[in-house]
Amino acid sequence: ASSAASDVYKRQAVFVFVSFFYEDTKNKLDKMNYPCTYSTYVEKAAKDYDLDPALIYAVIHTESGFDPKAESGVGAKGVMQMMPSSFEWLQEQRGCAGQYTEDDLFDPEICIDYGSYLLKYFYDYYGTERSAIAAYNAGFVVSDWLNDTNYSSDGKNLDSIPYPETENYVDKVESAKEMYIKLYYSQSN
């Protein structure tokens, strides 16, 4: 009987070891896939604009995968893939028109600051994180969607998004944000 109990104990010990090893390895792999690159800039922007740092990381993760030299086919630049026209407009909004050129968007510190400022602008303008994320991708057309009962039942929340690219984008950002919270900002990490 003690031999059978010993075998059960050994199997349980192996199971506990493998489970721990698997969880530890999975956590490390997840953190490699969801890094906290540019943490100084992200944490500063989160504080300055009262944004969840997990949201900023999620936008960067989705937009550029943290590549400071990223440039889209339509001309969006930097880690937060900001359009030069938006960057110029934001400089005017902040009273520093012409301080930077569009190539300054390749500087992660500048791009994260202005990208986060834009995200906060949309959050304040629309009042919900989901609408702010959609607007970060599609712009002020979100106003039309919120005023259309096909897309918003209450005029405040998007029930659906008519642009498949934007809907996919919002889903990716929300999923990435959940991972950042799980990996870095939850009590269990």
Model-derived features: where do they sit?
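Hydrophobic alpha-helical membrane-insertion segments, chiefly the h-region
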Residues: R11-F21
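Catalytic glycan-binding domains that act on GlcNAc-containing polysaccharides
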Residues: F20-N189
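Single conserved hydrophobic/aromatic residue that forms the stacking wall/gate
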Residues: A1-A5, Y9
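Intrinsically disordered low-complexity regions specifically enriched for long asparagine
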Residues: Y9-Q12, V173
